From Swiss-Prot:
A motif (Inverted processing quadruplet motif 4) lies at residues 147-150. A motif (Processing quadruplet motif 1) lies at residues 40-43. Residues 1-22 form the signal peptide. It is found in: Secreted. Expressed by the venom gland. Keywords: Amidation, Antibiotic, Antimicrobial, Fungicide, Repeat, Secreted, Signal, Toxin. Its main location: secreted. This is M-zodatoxin-Lt4b. M-zodatoxin-Lt4a: Probably forms an alpha-helix which disrupts target cell membranes.
Length: 179
């Protein structure tokens, strides 16, 4: 968890520095970022994106005002996840969609969450049911992802390391220019 927070902080800092640099030098960083996103999606970005969503849902789950989060935040996040999964499942050329494994399990979990979400006793579901279902989903995702996590973690670690080095270089050039 600490590693992902550090990685996120580095990514945000990298983008901020790159954008300020691009404004000064008149070059567009959005193309570079878009290329990185496409590359990330090609390397199994689906699983990583789902884990990011799960981590965001954990933050919502941990809040003390779980009643409000249960009614508004979690439901909105779940609908975003459903829409993303529909887009992924609609692609016939995706390997995972072809095999059906990960996407089928996720759609089963989403359908279970929809049943909980649709109940009229939303207060009860918001406090306990959805949180329990989310933790079950986290555990299932961990089992599915555990097979390829080592390889992805290494590539992510290398990517974060290179981003950190780039960030250091940008900071040094910025300090050299502006003192």
């Amino acid at each position: 968890m600490k590693f992902s927070i550090i990685a996120l902080a580095l990514a945000v800092a990298f983008v901020c520095v790159a954008e300020s640099r691009s404004e000064e030098e008149g070059y567009d960083v959005s193309e570079e970022i878009q290329a990185e996103e496409l590359e990330e999606a090609a390397r199994g970005g689906i699983n990583r994106k789902l884990m990011e969503m799960v981590n965001k849902l954990r933050k919502v789950q941990g809040r003390e005002d779980s009643e409000d989060a249960g009614r508004a935040g979690i439901n909105r996040k779940l609908m975003e996840m459903v829409n993303k999964l529909r887009k992924v499942q609609g692609r016939e050329d995706t390997e995972e969609a072809g095999r059906g494994g990960i996407n089928r399990k996720l759609m089963e979990m989403v359908n279970k969450l929809r049943k909980v979400q649709g109940r009229e006793d939303s207060e009860e579901a918001g406090r306990g049911g959805i949180n329990r279902k989310l933790m079950e989903m986290v555990n299932k995702l961990r089992k599915v992802q555990g097979r390829e996590d080592t390889e992805e973690a290494r590539s992510l670690k290398d990517k974060v390391k290179s981003m950190g080095e780039k960030l250091k270089q940008y900071i040094q050039t910025w300090k050299a220019k502006f003192g």
